[in-house]
UniProtKB/Swiss-Prot annotation:
The lineage of its organism: Bacteria, Pseudomonadati, Spirochaetota, Spirochaetia, Spirochaetales. GO terms for molecular function: iron ion binding; N(6)-L-threonylcarbamoyladenine synthase activity. The gene is tsaD. It is found in: Cytoplasm. Required for the formation of a threonylcarbamoyl group on adenosine at position 37 (t(6)A37) in tRNAs that read codons beginning with adenine. Is involved in the transfer of the threonylcarbamoyl moiety of threonylcarbamoyl-AMP (TC-AMP) to the N6 group of A37, together with TsaE and TsaB. TsaD likely plays a direct catalytic role in this reaction. GO terms for biological process: tRNA threonylcarbamoyladenosine modification. It comes from the Bacteria. Substrate binds at residues 132-136, 165, 178, 274. GO terms for cellular component: cytoplasm. Its cofactor is Fe(2+). This is tRNA N6-adenosine threonylcarbamoyltransferase.
Amino acid sequence: MKVLGIETSCDDCCIAVVENGIHILSNIKLNQKEHKKYYGVVPEIASRLHTEAIMSVCIKALKKANTKISEIDLIAVTSRPGLIGSLIVGLNFAKGLAISLKKPIICIDHILAHLYAPLMSSKIEYPFISLLLSGGHTLIAKQKNFDDVEILGKTLDDSCGEAFDKVAKHYNMGFPGGPNIEQISKNGDENTFKFPVTTFRKKENWYDFSYSGLKTACIHQLEKFKSKDNPTTKNNIAASFQKAAFENLITPLRRAIKDTQINKLVIAGGVASNLYLREKINKLKIQTYYPPLDLCTDNGAMIAGLGFNMYLKYGESPIETDVNSRIENYKNQYRRRK
């Protein structure tokens, strides 16, 4: 079965063709560079650019896959969570294709798709612990199947990727913040500033994260946390911030691994491409899986791959399915399917 996967939840216009949930025939992505001068994604600009680009991206994906549109068996599309305007462009495009081609459509949860992505490159037996790190989400999950996901912990304020973006914006390091800070930090001393690392002691927040304190310390209280007589350079700020940002993840992650007795870890999301993070995670000395770099960030392949499995198990989505920008009752919603 050939699945067309459409992902437009934020600023990347992504369309892929995947066969039988795992064989990637094409995986086309168009980055919207127009947001760089704003140091963040402007929703109105994102949706307009999706509208302008989505047809050409689809044509490129089909051509790369050597597949005619009539040979597509299923259309999978992100319907939540994300920017409303961007989601609408992708969903309406998918609905138009489904109706005109008389093909089934399956609406996909963006978070579940990120958690599925590592399975497209590695054979991983359930259960395992997943760590999702992206511009919009930071969470730890226990996975028993592609559709049986229990959120153990999440960020209580900024996501990890969002904190990187805000620090990078303040110090003019470029957008997106993650890859720019990673590059700039290579020539810095990570011990110049000793930024705070947040861990929670209450049971209800045992696996949760917080990045607001670290962000405030780095942007507004920089000199207060200086621990070495090194110059206050962008390189040293970037290196010290990156170190603290990833140390913020380690304690909740250790707790989740210990409490669940699950010794397999899957890392997903755009921040998972950070090589410094991978060094930190590898020190945990447990079996760890990373998706290839093109499956870390937003992509259509993960939508198509998960869509294939969801369709086989649950069938097609109602054509009237709408978009949703958020997940209400966040921690509990992901156990909705049994």
